[in-house]
Amino acid sequence: MLIRFKDKIPNLGQNVFVAEGAKIIGEVEIGDESSVWFNCVLRGDVNFIKIGKRTNIQDLTTIHVWHREFNEDGSLKDAGFPTCIGDDVTIGHNCVIHACKIGSRVLVGMNAVIMDDAAIGDDSIVGAGSVVTKGKKFPPKSLILGNPAKLIRELSNEEVAFLKQSALNYVEFKNDFLD
């Protein structure tokens, strides 16, 4: 379900699948061929959410932002933190993604949490159940695990190739629902 917030309405690219029960609210942009699965909540109410192409947001995931602040004259005082997710990303079931940046070709495992102002570099894996704390930054090709999450090692080329394939698998899954 697409829900207007004030003057902002979600903007979906071509061939995007939004499953029954999913709620996409306000200033949310979703790239072509992406999918938002059952009972997800994407709240672009007090800042924006941008999701790239061929990205899948799996069941029960919540994505939110940190609010912008304005001066009395309406000018921007603090930009807050939007949530920006790259292309070919897989966000596993029941994750919380809050006011952060996730690069392209990233896999975020089930039940992971990524907090405000954190950044995950391209071609990385955040393991299931990991908690990436506020402001933590990880370089490209990172294997990120734990609570609090730590850099374990650099990913191999074979592991990086899997990340793109994982996202492409979900493009096929969502196409089955659109047919």
Question: Which residue ranges define each predicted feature?
Answer:
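C-terminal segments of enzyme domains that contribute to small-molecule binding surfaces
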Residues: 2-11, 15, 19, 70-96, ...
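Left-handed beta-helix
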Residues: 14, 19-20, 25-26, 31-32, ...
